[in-house]
A protein has these predicted regions:
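Non-catalytic terminal/accessory segments
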Residues: 1-163
């Protein structure tokens, strides 16, 4: 199919030509030139690396919103964890290797949805700013780590959250 097929210039440190088409999407990843650090020499160079695509990011956020966590204020946190952990584990296994900061932003977005759930569930949080609720979630993550992304080290920020 000619609409889908395109030739892309794989820009790197060794090839410095300028072309209009240097990125492409494949299997939910966007391949594009980016700064990379060599493992042994610790030198920075331009490499062609995969990142999670904007299309995939949009779909994942839509899926997270479709869970309607805020309206499930009657549901305990461990039941929510049982519901979403297999999905979070799958996303982390697929996108986590090359997702980088864009995947971390998705996990922070999920933490923000959990904070909105807590605000709806507990009356004491209704007048508090979001960072107080995120600190509470961070304390739960330190104690229990019931969500998969908490278990692998992406715990809620105990301060302000940037999206």
């Amino acid at each position: 199919n000619e609409e889908k097929t395109k030739i892309v210039y794989c820009k790197s440190s060794r090839r410095k030509e300028n072309h209009s088409n240097v990125t492409f999407d494949f299997l939910g990843h966007t391949f594009r030139p980016c700064k990379t650090i060599h493992k042994s020499s610790r030198e920075a160079f331009t490499g062609f690396q995969p990142r999670i695509s904007m299309k995939s990011t949009t779909k994942i956020r839509a899926t997270m919103r479709s869970w309607n966590l805020k309206s499930k204020s009657h549901t305990p946190l461990d039941c929510i964890a049982q519901m979403v952990n297999p999905i979070l584990r799958g996303w982390a296994n697929y996108y986590g290797k090359y997702g980088g900061k864009s995947f971390q932003k998705l996990l922070r977005y999920f933490d923000l949805l959990l904070a909105k759930w807590a605000k709806a569930k507990y009356k004491t949080f209704r007048r508090n700013p979001m960072y107080v609720i995120l600190k509470w979630l961070g304390n739960i993550a330190d104690r229990d780590a019931i969500f998969y992304h908490w278990q692998i080290g992406f715990k809620p920020a105990k301060g302000t959250i940037k999206l």
